[in-house]
Amino acid sequence: LPIYSFAQIDEEKIGSWYMYFFTADFKESQFGVQGDIQYRNWNLGGDLEQLLLRGAMSYRLPDKSAKFAFGYAHITSGAFGASNSTSSESRIYQEVTVPQKMINGRLHLNHRFRYEQRFVETQDFRTRFRYNIFVNIPLNSKEIAKNTYYIALYNELFLNGEKEIGDGKMVELFDRNRAYMGLGYAINEKIRMQAGYMNQATNTVSKGQLQFSLHQNF
């Protein structure tokens, strides 16, 4: 987020993120596409924090031990409160996701490593490193199949690649951390939905967000 977005936010007010994620593999190929649309609010709705549009080409290793993606994102960020001012960011990114199962297959993990090249309005070119560990724990089945309820957890660490971002502004190496806990339900083999709570902490601000997401595999 642009620096001004965090200037006067209300840490006690719960925000809300409404998200749609999709993946589609090309038939008889390890290649595919993936992406997401996220509408983020400073409150439960109407005070825009961010509108994020992201898409990527993907390649999965034949043994499914890792998935690589190269993509682009466009982000519109809004200021907290009554102001209608916005700023924009274009972002190129590369990522690798490594799945893992533990405890006799009952614990479903995904390790995602992402490197971003960021073109933020009014700032110099920036880069950022991200590591996210996702953990899904099925409750009524060993696999996340149709009609499965599951606990969904993740923690994502963000690190800035540069400290100087232009116009005399400085940032720390640590950018932010997101910690999430939620409940998911697999409607069928291709569609899941989740709802949960995420806390996002920077060096100066900690704010809670309700998250509602739909995940679809084509």
Language-model segment annotations:
Residues 1-10, 218:
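Bacterial Sec-dependent N-terminal signal peptides
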Residues 8-71:
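Start-of-domain marker
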Residues 153, 162, 174, 178-218:
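Predominantly the C-terminal beta-signal and adjacent terminal strand-loop region
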Residues 26-31, 62-65, 101-108, 139-149, ...:
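Short loop/turn motifs that connect adjacent beta-strands in outer-membrane beta-barrel proteins
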Residues 31-35, 53, 66-70, 107-113, ...:
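Transmembrane beta-strands of outer-membrane beta-barrel proteins
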Residues 20-24, 55-59, 94-100, 115, ...:
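Residues on the lipid-exposed face of transmembrane beta-strands in outer-membrane beta-barrel proteins
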Residues 26, 37-43, 72-78, 100, ...:
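Transmembrane beta-strands of outer-membrane beta-barrel pores
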Residues 12-18, 49-53, 88-92, 123-129, ...:
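Residues that define the transmembrane beta-barrel architecture of outer-membrane proteins
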